Amino acid sequence: MTLQKQIYLKASKSDVWAYLTDPDKLAIWFHKPTKPLAEGDDYEMFGTESGDKLMWGKVVTANPHDHLSYTFTIGPMGDATSTVSWTLDDVAGGTRLSLTHEGLPAGEAAFGLTLALDKGWDDHLARMRESLHAA
């Protein structure tokens, strides 16, 4: 199963990149890692309020200001690993940010997880937009 999202942001690619890789910026809209996301590094992200480990994986690709991808695992997925990829494109007035979350468990039994992740990405991206547009 694959989820895809796309949003437009009134921000430069470098500002959007910071929101995807910098722990303090990630904490605003997503979950906070222990260190900046960098190619080849393992990562863990924690709830900003709970402090609980929520997701983990490895940064596969980090081409600054253009493309970021990492493996993505959360507790409800068990041992399954998916991949999150971000692509940043210049557009007049800002940046188009595209998300592809692929390799999610398929089938009727896993559809509840897909629905939760779909809504979660919508909520997270709305927070990113709100924060970037307020800056």
Map each language-model feature to its residues.
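Structural motif
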Residues: 13, 41-42, 66-67, 94-96
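Hydrophobic pocket/interface hotspot
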Residues: 16, 26, 59, 68-70, ...
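Short, flexible helix/strand-to-coil boundary loops that buttress conserved ligand/catalytic motifs
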Residues: 20, 30, 72, 132
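Hydrophobic-ligand binding "helix-grip"
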Residues: 35-36, 49-93, 102-105
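A conserved amphipathic terminal alpha-helix motif
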Residues: 103-135
